[in-house]
Regions:
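Signature for the C-terminal beta-barrel architecture of outer-membrane proteins
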Residues: 60-64, 82-203
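Beta-barrel outer-membrane channel/assembly domains of diderm bacteria
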Residues: 1-71, 94-105, 141, 178-196
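"Short basic amphipathic alpha-helical interaction patches in structured regions
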Residues: 41-42, 78-84
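Short acidic (Asp/Glu) patches
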Residues: 48-49, 78-80, 90
Length: 203
């Protein structure tokens, strides 16, 4: 029989926000680890920025948000902050949006590399963000106080090239679906349908 074990996993997060006129800035730094795993004198701390973004409001409902940010949509099955996990989840992306009383539309664009390559193409080595490129369009409409619907299309580009030769071969996987919420009186009824097509990084 396996022996029982015990440990304490800890996340310490410090968040700062700044707003002025049409500009908003968000910074969030965190340290994640198990108690006792770091030496008392540590020259290589694991303190990272999990959020660092700037948002500019253009007026009339239009805005742009650039930088490291959480992407949280609907019930978070497809895109969420994953804050139940000790580390959480973040994306380096540009978000363009329009919002009014009954409508929200967001376009999210991302391009990832894990090295400052100046030659040799755009091969994206594994081990960092799971995707190389991302384009996501999300739209939500509030029909009335009891019913709203959202639609999402996501195109993920994942590196499927030769790791030894570092030849890039991007494979594209698409996700398309809707999230419906109906709230009559004290009840909430929800439905979610999604379909995936395209190719994974293995083909």
């Amino acid at each position: 029989d396996a022996e029982s074990t015990g440990f304490i996993n800890n996340r310490a997060r410090l968040s700062l926000g700044y707003e002025r006129d049409r500009l908003s800035i968000g910074l969030s730094a965190q340290h994640v680890g198990v108690w006792g795993q770091d030496p008392q004198i540590d020259k290589n701390g694991r303190f990272i920025l999990n959020e660092a973004w700037a948002k500019l409001d253009f007026g009339s409902g239009f805005f742009a948000k650039l930088g490291r940010q959480s992407l949280v949509y609907d019930d978070e099955r497809i895109m969420g902050a994953l804050d139940w996990n000790v580390a959480g989840r973040y994306h380096d992306a540009l978000k363009l949006g329009y919002e009014n009383t009954n409508n929200q539309m967001h376009l999210i664009l991302a391009f990832n590399q894990n090295d400052e390559k100046t030659i040799g193409g755009t091969y994206y080595a594994p081990g960092a963000q799971p995707y190389k490129t991302m384009q996501t369009l999300w739209y939500k409409h509030l029909f009335d106080k009891s019913f709203n619907a959202s639609f999402l299309f996501m195109n993920l580009g994942m590196e499927g090239g030769d790791a030894e030769k570092q030849n890039s071969d991007t494979k594209y996987l698409q996700t398309l679906g809707t999230n419906l919420i109906y709230t009559p009186s004290n009840w909430t009824i929800g439905g979610t349908i999604f379909y995936q097509f395209g190719k994974t990084k293995s083909g």
